[in-house]
Amino acid sequence: MSNDTQPTIAIIGYGSQGRAHALNLRDSGFDVTVGLRPGGPTEAKAQADGFTVVAPAEAVKTADLVAVLTPDMVQKKLYEEVIAPNMKQGACLLFAHGLNVHFDMIKPRADLDVVLVAPKGPGALVRREYEIGRGVPCIYAVYQDTSGKAEQFALTYAGGLGGARANIIKTTFKEETETDLFGEQAVLCGGASSLVQAGFEVLVEAGYQPEIAYYEVLHELKLIVDLFYEGGITRMLEFVSETAQYGDYVSGPRVIDASTKARMKDVLTDIQNGTFTKNWVAEYEAGLPNYTKFKQADLEHPIEEVGKKLRAKMVWLNGEQQAAATPAKQQAA
C-alpha cells in the first residue's frame, strides 16, 4: 500500500456497482482511478463524475488495489489479457462476486493478494445510503494472502464503501459464490418470477380477469417483500389479516412442499459441483441461443402486456422506472 490505510485504487468497470464504489471510495478519501476501454458506453459518465479515466491496462499498473467490477463473463479475458500482464507486483486484486475465482476460470498470480467485497444491495442503494450517512452491509473474503495484509485490504475497502456503518461479515469465496447463485436461481429471481407467472396463469385459466390476477400475484408482492425486508416473515404476518395468516399457514406448504425443497437441493448441487457454471460458460460462448429464447419467452408472457398497461396508469412509478432502468444500461465497462 502507498501508506498504512489508504491504498490507491483502480476501479475496472463503471456500471451500477462500479460507479457506486468509485464515488463512495473517493468521498471516503481514497485516490481512485477508473479503468474503461476508450469510447466505451460509460466513459463519458465517469468523466462527468470527475474521475480520471484511462484504459484498464494503464489503470492497473500503479494501483495498490484493483477492483474488478465488470460482468462475470468478461472477467476471465479481461484478467488474462489486461490485468495479469500489467498489474504491479504485490498488489491486491478484488472482486465483488467470487464466481470466476471459485470455479478456477481466473487463476490469480501468486504474488497478488486476492479478496472479495460484496455489498448486499444494488449500486444505487450503496450510493444513496452512503450519501445520507448510512451504509449497506458488506460481506468479505480472502482467497489469497501473499502480503499478510489481504484481510486489511478487504476491510479498508468495505469501510470506504460505507459497509462499516451497517455490518461487515466474513465469508469465503466458496460460500459467497454458491449462496449468491442459489439465492438468485431458487428464490429471488428464478423462484419468485416462476411463482408469479404460475399464479397468474392459474387465475386467468380459471376465468378471472388478467388485470385482477396481475394485482393479486405481482403488484401486491412489493408490499409483502417490503415487510420481509423490514422485519422478516413474522413482521409480514403481523401486518396482514388473520385470514391471510391462516391461508399462509395451511396453503403455503401445499405450494412449497418437500418435493419443491428437494428440487431446490438439486439446484444447489448443480451450483456446487460446477454444472451450472459450466453450462453458463458454454451458453455464453455459443452466443446465448437459449438465453435469448428464454428471455423472449418471458417478454411474451401475458403478464407482461397486462402489467405494462396497468403500470402506465400508475403515474407515481415513472420516476422509479427511470431510476431502475439506468443501471441495466451500464453493465459493460
From Swiss-Prot:
Residues reported in the UniProt entry to bind NADP(+): Y14, G15, S16, Q17, R37, T42, D72, M73, V74, Q75, G123
The entry's keywords: Amino-acid biosynthesis, Branched-chain amino acid biosynthesis, Magnesium, Metal-binding, NADP, Oxidoreductase
Positions contributing to substrate binding: S241
InterPro entries given in the database record: 6-PGluconate_DH-like_C_sf, KARI, KARI_C, KARI_N, KARI_prok, NAD(P)-bd_dom_sf
Active-site residue list: H97
Pathway: Amino-acid biosynthesis; L-isoleucine biosynthesis; L-isoleucine from 2-oxobutanoate: step 2/4; Amino-acid biosynthesis; L-valine biosynthesis; L-valine from pyruvate: step 2/4
GO biological process, one term: isoleucine biosynthetic process
Domain KARI N-terminal Rossmann: 1-171
Binding site for Mg(2+) 1: D180, E184
GO molecular function, one term: ketol-acid reductoisomerase activity
Cofactor: Mg(2+)
Note on cofactor: Binds 2 magnesium ions per subunit.
Signal peptide feature range: none
Catalytic activity, EC: 1.1.1.86
Residue span, KARI C-terminal knotted domain: 172-317
EC category name: oxidoreductase
Domain of life: Bacteria
Biological role: Involved in the biosynthesis of branched-chain amino acids (BCAA). Catalyzes an alkyl-migration followed by a ketol-acid reduction of (S)-2-acetolactate (S2AL) to yield (R)-2,3-dihydroxy-isovalerate. In the isomerase reaction, S2AL is rearranged via a Mg-dependent methyl migration to produce 3-hydroxy-3-methyl-2-ketobutyrate (HMKB). In the reductase reaction, this 2-ketoacid undergoes a metal-dependent reduction by NADPH to yield (R)-2,3-dihydroxy-isovalerate.
PANTHER family: KETOL-ACID REDUCTOISOMERASE, MITOCHONDRIAL
Protein family (similarity comment): Belongs to the ketol-acid reductoisomerase family.
Name of this protein: Ketol-acid reductoisomerase (NADP(+))
